[in-house]
């Protein structure tokens, strides 16, 4: 089996096999082929010389060469760089030894070297090579490499110490981190508490503001309600006053209507009575000539002229008209009195009493100075014949000379017979 056919298979810790370049053993390049015996002897000599104890240096040698190789103490190398150099040298040597062994003896050899970096170096003959190339062999190698190391081994002790130191550092770092986290949490809690307090204060301030606004609104609403109630009460009072005024006005109107109705009834009754009296007078009246004869007789007895009597009568009539105008309040009475006065100016009128056509005439005639007789207003006896009261005692009595003391008309405007 030639050296060129041998290949190194590298398996990383993840289970992937890395195929590296074959290791090239440092063999002597000579044209003559070495026999297995010669090569074996030479290798044995080299091993003996490499593993043997170093001989004491001879003082007689003057060439300055070393007497032998320095013996290396077989123990774990702490220096990582030295350990890497030693691994590379020893790995090459052992690979060469495995090749020589398989070649010289014809035995099946399987060599596997795993570095601390996770690389795996293998040497296998043809029959044992499937253990490395097949997935089953790869998985087996990977499972073996994944098993924990022996704690009694020096490398494991150093690794444990390193791991312990690392663990301590990690624990310290974790503690620091935890302390920092606690401090951060405390700060966050304090900030949260401060924020909560601020929020509570803000909420309280907002609630107080809202309560104040609500109180102000309630006060405003109460004031508005009171104003509305006052306005409503005022309106109700005004309405009640208006209703009372309307009721009073209605009552007054009713009273006025009732009074008017009563007045109308009284006037109607008085008119009916007056009409009845006029009818009775017309039926039982005296001729006008009687009154003319009586007046002329009285004037003759008094010794006055007719002209003077007429003037006096006219003056008395005018005075009576003025008195009637002052006593009467309605225009209808004035018009009727004027009509009566105009009728009196006609001395030759022989008609009877003029019937009143206006129903609104004041029938309660209260002037005691004048009263109707015939077709004109005659003055009272006392005012008309006051000068002849003493001289006419021996004259015969006339129809106009009765009841001088009362100065009023007889009942039903009736005169005693002449």
Curated annotation (Swiss-Prot):
One of its GO terms (molecular function) is DNA-binding transcription factor activity, RNA polymerase II-specific. Gene3D superfamilies: Transcription factor, MADS-box (3.40.1810.10). Keywords: DNA-binding, Nucleus, Transcription, Transcription regulation. One of its GO terms (cellular component) is nucleus. Residues 14-67, 144-170, 301-351, 388-418 are annotated as: Disordered. Residues 67-127 form the MADS-box domain. It is found in: Nucleus. Residues 22-39, 51-61, 150-170, 306-351, 388-399 have a biased composition (Low complexity). Its main location: nucleus. Required for proper slug migration, spore differentiation and stalk differentiation (under nonbuffered conditions). Could be involved in late events of spore maturation necessary for spore stability. This is Serum response factor homolog A. It comes from Dictyostelium discoideum.
């Amino acid at each position: 089996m030639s050296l060129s056919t041998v290949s190194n298979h590298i398996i990383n810790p993840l289970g992937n096999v890395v195929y590296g370049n074959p290791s090239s053993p440092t063999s002597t390049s000579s044209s003559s082929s070495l026999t297995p015996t010669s090569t074996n002897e030479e290798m044995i000599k080299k091993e003996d010389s490499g593993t043997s104890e170093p001989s004491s240096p001879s003082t007689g040698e003057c060439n300055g060469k070393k007497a032998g190789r320095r013996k290396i103490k077989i123990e774990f190398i702490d220096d990582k760089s030295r350990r890497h150099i030693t691994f590379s040298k020893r790995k090459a040597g052992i690979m060469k030894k495995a090749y020589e062994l398989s070649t010289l003896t014809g035995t099946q050899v399987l060599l596997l070297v795993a570095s601390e970096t996770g690389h795996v170096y293998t040497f296998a003959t043809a029959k044992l090579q499937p253990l490395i190339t097949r997935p089953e062999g790869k998985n087996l190698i990977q499972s073996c490499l994944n098993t924990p190391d022996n704690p009694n081994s020096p490398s494991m002790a150093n690794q444990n110490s390193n791991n312990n130191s690392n663990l301590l550092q990690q624990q310290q770092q974790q503690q620091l981190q935890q302390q920092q986290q606690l401090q951060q949490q405390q700060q966050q809690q304090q900030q949260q508490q401060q924020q909560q307090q601020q929020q509570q204060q803000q909420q309280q301030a907002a609630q107080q503001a809202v309560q104040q606004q609500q109180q102000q609104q309630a006060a405003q609403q109460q004031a508005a309600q009171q104003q509305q109630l006052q306005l409503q009460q005022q309106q109700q009072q005004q309405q009640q006053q208006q209703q009372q005024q309307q009721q009073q006005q209605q009552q007054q109107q009713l009273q006025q209507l009732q009074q008017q109705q009563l007045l109308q009834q009284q006037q109607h009754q008085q008119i009916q009575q007056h009409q009845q009296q006029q009818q009775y007078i017309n039926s039982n009246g005296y001729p006008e000539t009687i009154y003319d004869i009586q007046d002329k007789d009285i004037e003759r007895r008094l010794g006055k002229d007719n002209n003077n009597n007429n003037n006096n009568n006219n003056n008395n009539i005018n005075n009576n008209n003025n008195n009637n105008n002052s006593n009467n309040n309605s225009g209808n009475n004035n018009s009727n009195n004027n009509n009566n006065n105009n009728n009196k100016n006609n001395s030759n009128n022989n008609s009877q009493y003029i019937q009143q056509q206006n129903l609104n005439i004041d029938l309660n005639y209260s002037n005691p100075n004048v009263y109707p007789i015939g077709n004109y207003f005659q003055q009272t006896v006392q005012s008309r014949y006051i000068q002849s009261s003493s001289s006419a005692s021996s004259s015969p009595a006339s129809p106009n000379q009765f009841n001088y003391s009362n100065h009023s008309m007889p009942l039903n405007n009736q005169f005693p017979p002449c």
